[in-house]
Amino acid sequence: HVIQICDLDGAFAPDDSVRENPSAEETLYSTTDIVTTNRDALIADRTTKRNGVGSLLKLDGFRKKQGGRTVLIPYRLFYVSRNLEHAFRGRTDNLDAQHKQSGAIKLADRFTRDPNLFSTTLQSLRRIHGNPATWEESWRYAMQDFHSLERGSNLAFVEPYLAGELQ
């Protein structure tokens, strides 16, 4: 199995929620809007991300020749919203690379020591992001309204996917 995890970064929020502020020091996200120094560039980036996600969601896997037959290596795309720090730590500020890395290491250490906490956290992130019953529902929810700006994730579906319970 191949799994890929992406940040949503508000990609599916309506374009009119992107506001331009030339004096903004960095792109700022909230649950209802995105403020940036270059609105057109950010909208173009979001369009690229939406199109990329749309293409990846259509993939069921990768085909590989093995001997005389073709083998399917299953593939599935998962998300965190808005990003890892927002989903898992509730951080809404923009972090530099060093703080992102140290935060990820602390999370990994915490979850390694308490795997049940990891599972509980994934289920909580699923519930607060529309409480979808299926992987497909999770993506439909994430693509509606402002949900790609809200905290949440569909990573709770990784384990059932790897166990062969999701098709």
Tell where the protein language model's regions lie, with residue ranges.
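C-terminal accessory helical subdomains adjacent to catalytic cores in phosphodiester-
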Residues: 3-167
